[in-house]
């Protein structure tokens, strides 16, 4: 799971490594969406020799495997047999390396101050296609029994869960074509910027495969190691993965019921509130955004406080004054190419989606797709 335009953040709790092609303060490895990456060319020359035996010969890898063996009680022979076939992935290291962004000058911005290119309407366009909406309805229809159960146990609307999976992988069509073992080995031992993080993911992945009786080399996913319909990183599978069809296994690659239950479980764990909306249109300014300390993912203020700060609410606004919210800015371009901003109040449900992917663009695209799926003719 998949990347942050205008969110001003620095940490990644749900590390799906989803990487949006828009600027913001995500960790360095969050630059490209897994679903986008699967279509990239893998034919470039590798930076290192992709010998299958290289990793097992390295002292740091042997030390790591010994620690995994000790911590998870996995036979050393199994670990060595599996890691012996791991190959260095130039693609994973290249795509994880951040690239400089091309700045532009806003019409109303001083000439000496540059702002990054950001256009939510362009970002959201492919996620709101007629095909993605229609496939979303099909996904809900064939999993009706599963969603009926999720309604009772979790209270997350089916169209929201469907939209997350639709944005992440087009309902399982683009789950990634990279060997997860190769990606995680490369990012653990050759990509030093995030080695500690990826070693934890690799250890969790090996433990999961051992317990589920899966050969790690057979698992395909994103270049960053995200897996399945919802693009969960291994630690997220371990923490929030659910056996949706009660068959005794958690399969987020081949089992839609497990994927649906796991996405719902994640959202609930991060504050999803049944019966509450997600985004509400308001009028605001950049000055208000800055003055109220906005820009994070938490609902850190209230409707009443933002109204006092100058945010204009529409008549018959449905949220109470003490409702926790955050101010959301979605920059985009008009027909003449000039930047302007649409403003919204996001509820704790918007924050829950942001914990899946710390990007206002991402969470808003999921929200819009969910709305289109719910309202489209059956």
Model-derived features: where do they sit?
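Cell-wall glycan-active module
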Residues: 1-4, 10, 19-193, 199, ...
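Acidic (Asp/Glu) carboxylate-rich active-site/surface patches
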Residues: 16
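Short, conserved active-site entrance elements at the starts or edges of catalytic domains
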Residues: 204
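Amphipathic alpha-helical interface segments
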Residues: 222-229, 236
């Amino acid at each position: 799971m998949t990347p942050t335009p205008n969110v001003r953040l620095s940490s990644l709790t749900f590390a799906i490594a989803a990487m949006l092609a828009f600027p913001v303060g995500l960790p360095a490895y969050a630059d490209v969406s897994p679903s986008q990456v699967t279509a990239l060319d893998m034919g470039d020359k590798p930076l290192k020799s992709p010998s299958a035996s290289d990793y097992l010969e390295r002292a740091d890898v042997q030390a790591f495997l010994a620690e995994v063996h000790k911590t998870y009680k996995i036979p050393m022979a199994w670990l060595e047999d599996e890691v012996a076939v791991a190959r260095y992935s130039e693609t994973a290291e290249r795509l994880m390396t951040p690239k400089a962004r091309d700045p532009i000058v806003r019409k109303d911005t001083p000439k000496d101050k540059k702002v990054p290119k950001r256009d939510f309407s362009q970002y959201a366009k492919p996620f709101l296609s007629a095909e993605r909406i229609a496939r979303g309805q099909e996904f809900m229809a064939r999993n009706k029994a599963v969603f009926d159960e999720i309604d009772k146990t979790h209270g997350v609307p089916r169209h929201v869960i469907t939209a997350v999976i639709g944005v992440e992988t087009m309902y399982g069509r683009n789950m990634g074509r990279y060997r997860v073992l190769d990606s995680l080995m490369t990012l653990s031992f050759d990509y030093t910027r995030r080695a500690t993080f990826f070693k934890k993911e690799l250890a969790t992945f090996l433990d999961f495969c051992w317990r589920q009786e899966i050969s790690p080399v057979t698992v395909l996913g994103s270049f960053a190691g995200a897996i399945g319909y919802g693009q969960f990183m291994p630690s997220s599978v371990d923490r929030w993965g659910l056996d949706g069809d009660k068959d005794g296994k958690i399969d987020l690659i081949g089992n839609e019921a497990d994927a649906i239950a796991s996405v719902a479980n994640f959202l609930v764990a991060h504050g999803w509130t049944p019966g509450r909306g997600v985004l509400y249109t308001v009028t605001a300014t950049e000055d208000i955004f800055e003055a109220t300390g906005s820009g994070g993912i938490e609902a850190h203020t209230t409707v009443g406080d933002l109204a006092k700060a100058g945010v204009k609410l529409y008549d018959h606004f449905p949220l109470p004054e003490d409702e926790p919210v955050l101010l959301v800015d979605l920059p985009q371009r008009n027909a003449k190419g000039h930047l302007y901003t649409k403003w919204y109040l996001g509820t704790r449900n918007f924050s829950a989606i942001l914990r899946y992917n710390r990007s206002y663009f991402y969470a808003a695209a999921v929200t819009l797709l969910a709305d289109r799926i719910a309202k489209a003719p059956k």
